[in-house]
Structures are given as structure tokens and as C-alpha cells.
């Protein structure tokens, strides 16, 4: 396997790692963290509003993580067999745009509400993910053009 395909394989593994990290962090926050412990339920709201919020967060996380797994697995398959389909480049581009949008929203939140350790960690995660998606796209296009 040449260097370009090895780099594509490495970035595919990193993207799968980010997807696993996202799932683990959300599950730990929901079931072990204190993210929902201090929520005040407004009057007239159903009693199970916190459970509904947790379910919604799990669904959003699942929808967010599925393209990451697809891009990572498909990129690894293309690194092994360059003649397979090329839909992973489009989805990596979509994830790259979402990472940029997330960084922009994090910076906007930091400007409006002040900085915190959570906002810095979210910003750093966004930068790292955006760089990995960009590099993934670069190497996937090189593999597509070479084979």
C-alpha cells in the first residue's frame, strides 16, 4: 500500500475514533454526569421532560455519528480497494462544513456568554475534526485520481 492510501487509512481510523469518542462522551454525560441534575422544570411541562430531552439528545447524537462511521469505514475500504464507490468524499465534505459551523457557533457562544473550559474543549474538538475531515478529503481525492 502506498503512502497516500496509508494516510487515507489513518484518517479513516481517526474519524471512527472521533465517532466512538462522541458516543462514549454523550452516554457518560447522560447517565453518569450532572448535565441534567440541576434542570428546573417549568410549570405546565410534563413530568418526564428531562427524559424526553435525554432521548432527543441520544437521537441527535445517533444521527450525527452515523455519517462519521460511514465516512471512516468507507474511507478504510477505499484505502484497501481504490476501485470501490466514492460517496465518502461527499459525506466528509458535509461533516467538514458541520465542524466549521460548530466552531462558529462555539465562538459566538464564547463572545456572548464568556469563555469556559467546556467551550474551549468544544472549540478544540471542532478544530481537530475539521482538520481531519479536510485531510481525509485531500487524501481521498488523491486516491480517486491515482487509481
Residue positions per predicted region:
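Cytosolic juxtamembrane helix and N-cap/initiation of the first transmembrane helix
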Residues: 1-31, 48, 142-147
